[in-house]
Curated annotation (Swiss-Prot):
Taxonomic placement: Bacteria, Pseudomonadati, Thermodesulfobacteriota, Desulfuromonadia, Geobacterales
Species for this entry: Citrifermentans bemidjiense (strain ATCC BAA-1014 / DSM 16622 / JCM 12645 / Bem)
Keyword Transcription regulation listed: no
Protein name per Swiss-Prot or TrEMBL: 3-dehydroquinate synthase
Gene expressing this chain: aroB
Residues that, per the record, bind NAD(+): 74-79, 108-112, 132-133, 145, 154, 172-175
Pathway of action: Metabolic intermediate biosynthesis; chorismate biosynthesis; chorismate from D-erythrose 4-phosphate and phosphoenolpyruvate: step 2/7
NCBIfam families per the UniProt record, alphabetical: aroB (TIGR01357)
Amino acid sequence: MIAEKIRVALDERSYDIEMGAGNLDRIGSLCREVGLSGTAAVVSNTTVAPLYYETVRLSMERAGYRVVPVTLPDGEGYKNSATLNLIYDGLVDASLDRGSFILALGGGVIGDMAGFAAASYLRGIPFVQIPTTLLSQVDSSVGGKTGINHPRGKNLIGAFYQPKAVLIDVATLDTLPKREFLSGLGEIVKYGAVLDGGFFDFLEKNAKLLLARDKEALIQAVSRSCAIKAKVVAEDEREGGVRAVLNYGHTLGHAVETLTGYTRYLHGEAVAIGMVQAARLSQHYGFCSQADRERIEALVVALGLPTELPSFPPQQYREALSHDKKVRDKGLLFICNQGIGAYRMERLTDLGALLEICGIGE
């Protein structure tokens, strides 16, 4: 069932997000509709490939494509140059040329790495996103950010490279482990907290349905998240201005991931911590009320997500924050709450004060 199509309007690089439940077997037809030809390399991982590769392969072969698998180890810890080289090896071994393309079948790690491989292999071949986790469906598969991590920071190596299409099948969430599902809900909260107060109300009212993975509630939540992100990306594709709002919760969240070696927290869990801390900081500076801060924190808790920064010395936090991609000469760009559903961007030069407000003092 196709429930909706959302357009990401980027002139000649525009594309559709096709959303539904049980529509994964449409991938071959979709690739034909967007004009793709040649061999399709399906980049996936050892968790997702056993579940969905055959469905994708059969659909692609019915549409007349040659299909080759490139299967990687699973986990954020593998989002690095060594694993990226495994993708290149698979593409070279299969003799992919510039008339071929990549299907990114998996979560955010697969989408980011496969997208970066597509951007750089033979100086660029097309790719299609098939996100199978909630987090990747509402965030990383839309907008063209691709890349890998560096030992000193998250997503420090990458490129903006738009897919030809995105196919979202919320039925793939049925096989998603609970913790990863909750992690995706954390990223959804972001959109309501700083961009759409009505959507935040929806999340508060439908938290139980979302936790139960109700298909109708999920399609609404994923669709609204994608529509919000598509609008922001259309206004600011390369994060030169308003798109930075999508980093709400990510500044401290990325620091948490870096300090814990990408092993203790899932991305959405780290973002949830970052959002709560951003709301506390916003209340401290008078940008939002205590009631607004409490609503954000209560929704994060209701969705089973963490709220507190892990204990590390302030100097380690400062070091991690100093490598954030939003650092400029005038300080760290921090996304704050301006009530519920609105935001303001602040340049913070005193990282020590920021950490003290968040409970990490000397």
